Amino acid sequence: MFKPGYSEAKKPKITDEFSYKQT
């Protein structure tokens, strides 16, 4: 699942990327 911040930034932040991989 893509996080809101992921879509807005279009670039996964370190924390966002980690959460993305966890989901």
From Swiss-Prot:
- On whether Nucleus is a keyword of this UniProt record, the answer is yes
Instruction: Point out the signal peptide segment.
Output: none
**One GO CC term of this entry?**
nucleus
**Compartment(s) where it occurs, according to its Swiss-Prot or TrEMBL record:** Cytoplasm; Nucleus
Q: Does the keyword Nucleus apply?
A: yes
List keywords of the entry alphabetically: Cytoplasm, Nucleus
Give a brief account of the tissues where this protein occurs: During early embryogenesis expression is initially detected at the early cleavage stages in the nucleus of two discrete cells. Subsequently, expression is abundant in the cytoplasm of the newly formed pole cells. Male-specific expression during the third larval instar.
Additional note from the record: Mst40 sequences are organized as a tandemly arrayed 1.4 kb repeat unit. The repeat is conserved in all D.melanogaster strains examined but absent from other Drosophila species.
Which protein is depicted?
Protein male-specific 40
